[in-house]
C-alpha cells in the first residue's frame, strides 16, 4: 500500500507497471473485491461521466437560474473557428462546465473527488480522448490514475472545501486530471507526479466562497480553469519540466494553507465573492427571508 506520491511512483517504477495498475492492486487488497468487480465499478463511473457531459452539452440550467448554458456557448465558439486557445483546451473547458452545470441542475454526476469539482477529470478525459483515441480500457485506467493521486491528497491533506478551501476541491481535481493525462499520453510515473505538483502549486490559496452557499457561482467556472490548468501542466511535464518542490511537499503545503484559512473562506458563504454586494443580492433573491428558497417558479418552504 502506498501512503504518498513518492511511494506510489516507486511502486510503479519497481513493478514496471502504470500507476493505474498500482491503484487497482491496492483496491483489490483493501476492498476484497475481484479485479473484474473493481474495474466494473469504475466503468460504471465512466458511464455516469459520459452521460453528464452529453446532457450538459445539450444545455441545462439550474433551478436558481445562477448557472447554465455556458457549455453550449463555449462549444459554439469552438465551432466558429475564432477561438484563440487550442481546441483540446477549450473542449476540456466546455465539458468541465457541462458536468458542473448538470450538477447544479440536480443531475447525476460522479464526484471526482467532490461534486463541486466533478467537472475537471471528465472534462479533460473526454477532451484528450478526441486527440489520443484511447480504448475504453485506457479511459478506465485514466480514472484509476486520477484516483491514486486523489487518494494521496485525501489521506495527507483534504479534498473538502469546508476544510481546505477550493484549492482542496478544484485544486485536487486539477492535479488528479493532470497526472492521469500524462499517463494516458505515455508519460512516466514521475512525470505524472510532476504534473500533479505543477498543477497544485498554481491552485494554492484558492478559497471556497460559493454565492448563497450553492455550488454554482463561482464553482462552475472554477472547474473550467481547473481543466485548463491540468492540460497545461500535463503538457509541461511531458515536455520535461519539473517542479522544484516535490509533489508530496506541495500537497502538505496545501494542507497547511487550508488550516490557516479563516472559516469565512471555507464554504461558509461568509466571505470572498459570496460577500460582495452582488453576491448578497443574489442570495437575497434566492432565499428571501431565509426560510423560503425561490427556485424560478418553484418554491420550497
Residue ranges and their predicted role:
Residues 1-107, 131, 240, 247-301:
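Generic N-terminal targeting/processing segments that precede catalytic cores or assembly contacts
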Residues 35, 39, 82, 86-89, ...:
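Amphipathic, non-membrane alpha-helical segments in soluble helical-bundle scaffolds
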Residues 89-104, 127-156:
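Helix-rich "cap/lid" substructures immediately adjacent to catalytic or cofactor-binding pockets
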Residues 100-110, 153-163, 210-215:
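Glycine/charged-rich beta-loop-alpha catalytic/anionic-binding loops adjacent to active sites
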Residues 101-126, 167-174:
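Glycine/serine-rich anion-binding loops at beta->alpha junctions
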Residues 117, 135, 139-142, 146, ...:
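Hydrophobic alpha-helical segments and helix-packing faces
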Residues 122-133, 181-186:
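Alpha-helical support elements that line or immediately flank enzyme active sites
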Residues 161-174, 178-184, 189-301:
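A structural signal for small-residue-enriched, beta-sheet-centric alpha/beta enzyme cores
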Amino acid at each position: 500500500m502506498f501512503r504518498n506520491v513518492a511511494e506510489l511512483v516507486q511502486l510503479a517504477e519497481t513493478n514496471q507497471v502504470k500507476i493505474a495498475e498500482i491503484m487497482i492492486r491496492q483496491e483489490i487488497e483493501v476492498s476484497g473485491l475481484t479485479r473484474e468487480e473493481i474495474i466494473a465499478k469504475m466503468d460504471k463511473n465512466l458511464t455516469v461521466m459520459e452521460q453528464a457531459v452529453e446532457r450538459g452539452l445539450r444545455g441545462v440550467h439550474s433551478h436558481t437560474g445562477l448557472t447554465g448554458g455556458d457549455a453550449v456557448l463555449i462549444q459554439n465558439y469552438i465551432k466558429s473557428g475564432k477561438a484563440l486557445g487550442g481546441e483540446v483546451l477549450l473542449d476540456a473547458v466546455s465539458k468541465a462546465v457541462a458536468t458542473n452545470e448538470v450538477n447544479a441542475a440536480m443531475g447525476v454526476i460522479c464526484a471526482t473527488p467532490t461534486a463541486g469539482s466533478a467537472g475537471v477529470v471528465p472534462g479533460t478525459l473526454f477532451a484528450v480522448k478526441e486527440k489520443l483515441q484511447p480504448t475504453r480500457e485506457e479511459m478506465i485506467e485514466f480514472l484509476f490514475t486520477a484516483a491514486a493521486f486523489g487518494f494521496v491528497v485525501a489521506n495527507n491533506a483534504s479534498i473538502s472545501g469546508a476544510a481546505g478551501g477550493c484549492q482542496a476541491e478544484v485544486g485536487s481535481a486539477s492535479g488528479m486530471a493532470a497526472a492521469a493525462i500524462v499517463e494516458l499520453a505515455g508519460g512516466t510515473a514521475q512525470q505524472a507526479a510532476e504534473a500533479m505538483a505543477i498543477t497544485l502549486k498554481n491552485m494554492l490559496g484558492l478559497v471556497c466562497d460559493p454565492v448563497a452557499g450553492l455550488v454554482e457561482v463561482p464553482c462552475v467556472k472554477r472547474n473550467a480553469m481547473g481543466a485548463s490548468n491540468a492540460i497545461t501542466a500535463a503538457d509541461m511535464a511531458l515536455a520535461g519540466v519539473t517542479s522544484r518542490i516535490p509533489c508530496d511537499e506541495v500537497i502538505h503545503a496545501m494542507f497547511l494553507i487550508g488550516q490557516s484559512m479563516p472559516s469565512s473562506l471555507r464554504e461558509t458563504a461568509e466571505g470572498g465573492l459570496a460577500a460582495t454586494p452582488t453576491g448578497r443580492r443574489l442570495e437575497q433573491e434566492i432565499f428571501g427571508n431565509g426560510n423560503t428558497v425561490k427556485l424560478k417558479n418553484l418554491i420550497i418552504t
